[in-house]
From Swiss-Prot:
Gene Ontology cellular-component annotations: cytosol
Protein name per its UniProtKB record: Translational regulator CsrA
Top-level lineage group: Bacteria
Gene: csrA
Role played: A translational regulator that binds mRNA to regulate translation initiation and/or mRNA stability. Usually binds in the 5'-UTR at or near the Shine-Dalgarno sequence preventing ribosome-binding, thus repressing translation. Its main target seems to be the major flagellin gene, while its function is anatagonized by FliW.
UniProt keyword Disulfide bond present: no
Family: Belongs to the CsrA/RsmA family.
MF (Gene Ontology): mRNA 5'-UTR binding
Gene Ontology terms: biological process: bacterial-type flagellum organization; mRNA catabolic process; negative regulation of translational initiation; regulation of bacterial-type flagellum assembly; regulation of carbohydrate metabolic process
Keywords: Bacterial flagellum biogenesis, Cytoplasm, Repressor, RNA-binding, Translation regulation
Length: 79
């Protein structure tokens, strides 16, 4: 992990398209400004981890779930 020291108004550039600037420091909180392409997703880490967990949960299905779904689809009356 790269650890840098920055003052208010100073920035860090990542690659050619991402710039992170220290906007404000209050007590133990640091406010960051991030300039990045609009198509790049930027999340706070706790939100990112929550989304990952929800995705894992949604992808976690079992054979019984599939059999139940097939049964429901096949239970309609056919004439």
């Amino acid at each position: 992990m790269l650890v840098l020291t920055r003052k208010i108004g100073e920035a860090v550039t990542i690659g050619d398209q991402i710039r992170i600037m220290v906007v404000e420091v209050k007590g133990n909180q640091v406010r960051l400004g991030i300039e990045a392409p609009q198509d790049m997703r930027i999340y706070r880490e706790e939100i990112y981890l929550q989304v990952q967990e929800e995705n894992r949960h949604a992808a976690d299905w079992n054979l019984t779930d599939l059999e139940n779904a097939v049964s429901l689809l096949g239970s309609g009356d056919k004439e």
